[in-house]
Structures are given as C-alpha cells and as structure tokens.
Amino acid sequence: MDHLVKIIEKKYEKKEIPDFRPGDTVRVHVKVIEGDRERTQVFEGIVIAKRGSGINKTFTVRRIGSHGVGVERIFPVHSPVVEKIEVVRKGKVRRAKLYYLRNVRGKIRIKERRD
C-alpha cells in the first residue's frame, strides 16, 4: 500500500524547486483566479518554517505588509497554484523555526549566508 502512495505522489511532485532554507528571503509567484481572468501575484518575504515531507511539504513566508502589520502565508511546495519560487537572498540563521520573528519590532536583519 505504501508503495502505491509513493508512485502516485511522484506523479504530482514538481521538479524545478530551488533549494531554500528558513532565513532565506524568497519571492513566491502565486496564480490567482479572479472571476474569468487569471493573473500572477508575487509574495516576497522571509521563510520562517518548513515542514512536512513528500507531496505534503509546506513552507511559511512572513513579510511586513502595509502599516507595519505582519503577514504570513503558508504555501504547499508542490501546489499547482505556486508557479515559481525565487531565492532573493540567503540568510544565515541557527534555528529551523523562526517563530521568534513574530515578536520582533522594527527592521529585522538576518546575516547573509555565503555558500
């Protein structure tokens, strides 16, 4: 049974996913359908968490929206709604989950990682 699930999941996995980690700044291109027309919306922010495995893998992106309000979105990595993921900047952090950034006020500075 487990073997059959893996075969079906393999069919829906995306191939062109860039390597990114928590702390990286990413630009996610999301397909939005409004009525009869379709457009691409860009959401740029810091990856604060990655979770799951296989086709159920998700990542959380946080950015500071208008009026200083924090906005977080959870994206499934293999979703057909996510058109493209671009890594804008690689961040150097020592945690897998950056939930502490929710409580930080002002400009968040994360050092840049040099690979």
Swiss-Prot record:
<dbReference type="Pfam" id="PF01245">
    <property type="entry name" value="Ribosomal_L19"/>
</dbReference>
<protein>
    <recommendedName>
        <fullName>Large ribosomal subunit protein bL19</fullName>
    </recommendedName>
</protein>
<keyword id="KW-0689">Ribosomal protein</keyword>
<dbReference type="InterPro" id="IPR008991">
    <property type="entry name" value="Translation_prot_SH3-like_sf"/>
</dbReference>
<dbReference type="GO" id="GO:0006412">
    <property type="term" value="P:translation"/>
</dbReference>
<dbReference type="InterPro" id="IPR038657">
    <property type="entry name" value="Ribosomal_bL19_sf"/>
</dbReference>
<dbReference type="InterPro" id="IPR018257">
    <property type="entry name" value="Ribosomal_bL19_CS"/>
</dbReference>
<dbReference type="GO" id="GO:0003735">
    <property type="term" value="F:structural constituent of ribosome"/>
</dbReference>
<dbReference type="InterPro" id="IPR001857">
    <property type="entry name" value="Ribosomal_bL19"/>
</dbReference>
<dbReference type="GO" id="GO:0022625">
    <property type="term" value="C:cytosolic large ribosomal subunit"/>
</dbReference>
<comment type="function">
    <text>This protein is located at the 30S-50S ribosomal subunit interface and may play a role in the structure and function of the aminoacyl-tRNA binding site.</text>
</comment>
<keyword id="KW-0687">Ribonucleoprotein</keyword>
<comment type="similarity">
    <text>Belongs to the bacterial ribosomal protein bL19 family.</text>
</comment>
